[in-house]
Amino acid sequence: MATKLFPKFSQGLAQDPTTRRIWYGLAMAHDFESHDGMTEENLYQKIFASHFGQLSIIFLWTSGNLFHVAWQGNFEQWVTDPVHIRPIAHAIWDPHFGQPAVEAFTRGGASGPVNISTSGVYQWWYTIGMRTNQDLYVGSVFLALVSAIFLFAGWLHLQPNFQPSLSWFKDAESRLNHHLSGLFGVSSLAWTGHLVHVAIPESRGQHVGWDNFLSVLPHPQGLTPFFTGNWAAYAQSPDTASHVFGTAQGSGQAILTFLGGFHPQTQSLWLTDMAHHHLAIAVIFIVAGHMYRTNFGIGHRMQAILEAHTPPSGSLGAGHKGLFDTVNNSLHFQLGLALASVGTITSLVAQHMYSLPPYAFQAIDFTTQAALYTHHQYIAGFIMCGAFAHGAIFFIRDYDPEQNKGNVLARMLDHKEALISHLSWVSLFLGFHTLGLYVHNDVMQAFGTPEKQILIEPVFAQWIQAAHGKALYGFDFLLSSKTSAAFANGQSLWLPGWLDAINNNQNSLFLTIGPGDFLVHHAIALGLHTTTLILVKGALDARGSKLMPDKKDFGYSFPCDGPGRGGTCDISAYDAFYLAVFWMLNTIGWVTFYWHWKHLTLWQGNVAQFDESSTYLMGWLRDYLWLNSSQLINGYNPFGMNSLSVWAWTFLFGHLIYATGFMFLISWRGYWQELIETLVWAHEKTPLANLVYWKDKPVALSIVQARLVGLAHFSVGYIFTYAAFLIASTSGRFG
């Protein structure tokens, strides 16, 4: 008999008489493949439609950012003095605020309590040519409309007449062409257009709006140089070093340049360099989007390319034969590849946003710099873990050994022991040596002989920095050698502003490094290799191992195969993912600690503190964590509170969430089941209370679910705690 209870997608679960029905229902809600009556075509259609919903939410969110700043922010005031006025994210209304809180949170020229923005949106909107609240409102309304259109498109593509067929989804060449040319190419071209027609004129004091954008020439010669082949004209007469951003003072006429370095006043990349970059990207991707064969019988076939990739030596076996269908028929493989790419790019964004700041005055807003770096590194960590999770699910659900016989994918599985043992060896080597050096240095500090520390100069990294033009180390090589051809061409032709930037101590480009950096670099390498070891092992052992050859029959997440097969606990692919997330968080902790402490000392003009204290563990604990948490733990005290009080409270709250995670991670299912049964007995025996009864018999979470709950609390608490520390210690110090 069919039941109407949740979950509709699984009759088996809907008929479960216990609370398993609810928790398993939530766990399986997005695992469309496992739903009753699911066909491959319907699976693709559902996922396709959900993408529109995702985009709709993103546009609504960005619309909300614009709307709240326009309504409650101080954008127009900030534009007049971006260096000294603090940007307001939105107003705060809280009935708990007393007079001291109202006063503490009333800042940035506001009339009541507000939140200060640390996301960089003010700097971004200013750089791309926005100047008034009206600009922000128009953008907000436009994005809200786009959001509504995407929501409608999602609904539309669920209707039978508008559902694409399976063959449409499997047409990889067409999809690649459209995504390369359309998504990346044309959007980059459009962005170049915006920079050239709106942002660059605004940066030179020439307002461009809907009223005049068709009549204002971005370059005095118009399109003549383009059609006559005299493209160099667009690079002539760039903005000068004395240019005041947003005014005509010191401005030039160039629109596409190759200057290198930073605008002296805003400390950000030259807008004309960025326009040039996006134009180049657009050309490359529009060309790339015409590579693959579709309707006209010209161009490459992906399958042919892959099957031709068989080295004549025979050392790769069947090479890439069979891979096209393997990838094209597995959504998990495709998602794994996409997540790995996006995760890598997100980490690169973190690295480049601070070292090469693209937005005007971003570099001097230290809290924003710290927040953006930390945010993007954490996001990258979670996405990368997801890539390996879906790689493992691919091996369990979608991998066909017959179809991949002897190819590179099968060979990865065939020599997995070598891969895993090498990763293990590297992790052990890095761990013991790095910890050994740190601990030795701690002992020397503790025993009063700091001169006996083992301090290793990172000579290879310094040599690489010197090759890129950093003169400090005296290597006299390539760009740091005045006699080399690289130096001569760099000064005249390629990025003439680069060498000034790399040798300027006021920015974050190629920071000076020493023994402390050498040690923390290897600590981070330990974290990266250990995380990779756990993730790679989880995916490569997902189908089976010597211990459990039939593992794939148990699915992605299983706790054990009962008491009969001792030692099968904790070896599911999900367990590997679960363990890897802890190591990922650990690693990103070290990465962000390093970045933040290095920059705090740089911004304070006190680099010696990092250089001297980062070579031993007590230095990190005492001079980074303890010293910088003083503002936090004084956000409120018996004598009153200040504007850091909300971060001080969040710091405590983050610790609470984090600690709650251990309650689920350390005690297993039996404890909770026993406790629940005792509570059920007490409930049934209590007068009045026993008049109220439940439809679903209460049972404990499964081991797998409890681990997820524990992991979620651990992760969220960990991140909240560090976010509060990061923002309070930076903003408390630099305002």
Curated annotation (Swiss-Prot):
Chlorophyll a B3 binds at residues 663, 671. Changing residue 655 to R: No PSI detected. [4Fe-4S] cluster binds at residues 560, 569. It catalyses: reduced [plastocyanin] + hnu + oxidized [2Fe-2S]-[ferredoxin] = oxidized [plastocyanin] + reduced [2Fe-2S]-[ferredoxin]. NCBIfam families: psaB. It comes from Chlamydomonas reinhardtii. Its EC number is 1.97.1.12. It is an enzyme of class 1 (oxidoreductase). The gene is psaB. It is a multi-pass membrane protein. This is Photosystem I P700 chlorophyll a apoprotein A2.
